[in-house]
From Swiss-Prot:
Organelle targeting peptide span: 1-28
SUPFAM superfamilies: Thiamin diphosphate-binding fold (THDP-binding)
Record's keyword annotation contains Transferase: no
Annotated keywords: Magnesium, Metal-binding, Mitochondrion, Oxidoreductase, Pyruvate, Thiamine pyrophosphate, Transit peptide
Class of enzymatic activity (EC top level): oxidoreductase
Enzyme Commission designation: 1.2.4.1
Organism: Arabidopsis thaliana
Regulation: E1 activity is regulated by phosphorylation (inactivation) and dephosphorylation (activation) of the alpha subunit.
Source lineage: Eukaryota, Viridiplantae, Streptophyta, Embryophyta, Tracheophyta
Gene name, Swiss-Prot/TrEMBL: IAR4
Protein name: Pyruvate dehydrogenase E1 component subunit alpha-2, mitochondrial
Main function: The pyruvate dehydrogenase complex catalyzes the overall conversion of pyruvate to acetyl-CoA and CO(2). It contains multiple copies of three enzymatic components: pyruvate dehydrogenase (E1), dihydrolipoamide acetyltransferase (E2) and lipoamide dehydrogenase (E3).
Residues annotated as binding pyruvate: 94, 120-121, 169, 171, 200-202, 229, 231
């Protein structure tokens, strides 16, 4: 009965994209950097604020970069799937395929001075912030050269030099941390904002409302981004939320609902949100998106939703295919050029995997690095408590 009810709701995922396929484009000149105006077919829905313009200014160069970056992210996640099944990745692993438009669209609207903090589904956000594939794969496999020195794993990617403050494993716990980052930005007069990303499952957490309250009270430059992929683990939004209009959850805080599988719509929304947050304080962005994999690698992803639903979203809403259509329809690239690019990306990912496999395992001393105060004299023993493994200085 639950499945039949869920199946009847599958059209919810398809409606925005069916409307979104036709887009009107005006090309001013034919050079790569020349401006192109694309009008999104899916309108933004706003709460307590004006909606941004649906006319998005871009360029053929940017659209091509969107395709390349999303294709790289997709291939990385596919490779991670294989590595996990080969038992080269241990523990938790949450994949982002299907949601790539969020990572690239957001980056197109902000700078590295702006901070991002997210949940455990963080691989592509790390790459979007300028992270290297080899650093990602090294971290996934627990190697010394990983972005968190092999100690974070899938859920705890990190890149401080690009203002990426992680991957966090506790549902919703990153939201107050993100608002704290926004407080620091305001205190230091940085003229920057923080994007705190969370899923629809975390949208029901009490700490979200507490952080939102203080952010609004102090007019912090915090942008709370709900990545609504419609399932919190295996629980559909209609089962967990009385009001699944997450962009309205702030009540007194403005919000915007966005087609999260359209990279250009995401870019426009994030640009609008940044301008708003710097002047007026927090805003909520609800990104309507979809994940192709299950919640994690232990979840087949097909027990609480139908395979027809998944394939239906792929056919009409896939973020990469939508950009591919733009590139082909408007003669920005040929089919062969795009296939060649995908072939190069596949090799790039394969090379990164091979290089990461050669990276050494962290030293035993890394178990306590960044954990305890230096010179505290903590000792580490083997499982039998007999053999001394490492003594901290």
């Amino acid at each position: 009965m639950a499945l039949s009810r869920l199946s009847s709701r599958s059209n919810t995922f398809l409606k925005p994209a069916i409307t979104a396929l036709p887009s009107s484009i005006r090309r001013h000149v034919s050079t790569d950097s020349s401006p192109i105006t694309i009008e999104t077919a899916v309108p933004f829905t706003s709460h307590l604020c004006e909606s941004p313009s649906r006319s998005v200014e871009t360029s053929s160069e940017e659209i091509l970069a969107f395709f390349r970056d999303m294709a790289r992210m997709r291939r990385m996640e596919i490779a991670a799937d294989s590595l996990y099944k080969a038992k080269l990745i241990r523990g938790f692993c949450h994949l982002y395929d299907g949601q790539e438009a969020l990572a690239v669209g957001m980056e197109a609207a902000i700078t590295k001075k702006d901070a991002i903090i997210t949940s455990y589904r963080d691989h592509c956000t790390f790459i979007g912030r300028g992270g290297k594939l080899v650093d990602a794969f090294s971290e996934l496999m627990g190697r010394k050269t990983g972005c968190s020195h092999g100690k974070g794993g899938s859920m705890h990617f990190y890149k401080k030099d690009a203002s990426f403050y992680g991957g966090h494993g506790i549902v919703g716990a990153q939201i107050p941390l993100g608002c704290g980052l926004a407080f620091a930005q305001k205190y230091n007069k940085d003229e920057a904002v923080t994007f705190a990303l969370y899923g629809d499952g975390a949208a029901n957490q009490g700490q979200l409302f507490e952080a939102l309250n203080i952010s609004a009270l102090w007019d912090l430059p915090a942008i709370l981004v709900c990545e609504n992929n419609h399932y919190g683990m295996g629980t559909a939004t209609w089962r967990s939320a009385k009001s699944p209009a997450y962009f309205k959850r702030g009540d007194y805080v403005p919000g915007l609902k966005v087609d999260g599988m359209d990279a250009l719509a995401v870019k426009q929304a994030c640009k609008f949100a940044k301008e708003h947050a710097l002047k007026n304080g927090p805003i909520i962005l609800e990104m309507d998106t979809y994940r192709y994999h299950g919640h994690s690698m232990s979840d087949p992803g097909s027990t609480y939703r139908t395979r027809d639903e998944i394939s239906g979203v792929r056919q009409v809403r896939d973020p990469i295919e939508r950009v591919r259509k733009l590139l082909l329809t408007h003669d920005i690239a040929t089919e062969k050029e795009l296939k060649d690019m995908e072939k190069e990306i596949r090799k790039e990912v394969d090379d990164a995997v091979a290089q990461a496999k050669e990276s050494p395992i962290p030293d035993a001393s890394e178990l306590f690095t960044n954990m305890y105060v230096k010179d505290c004299g903590v000792e580490s023993f083997g499982a039998d408590r007999k053999e001394l493994k490492v003594t901290l200085p």
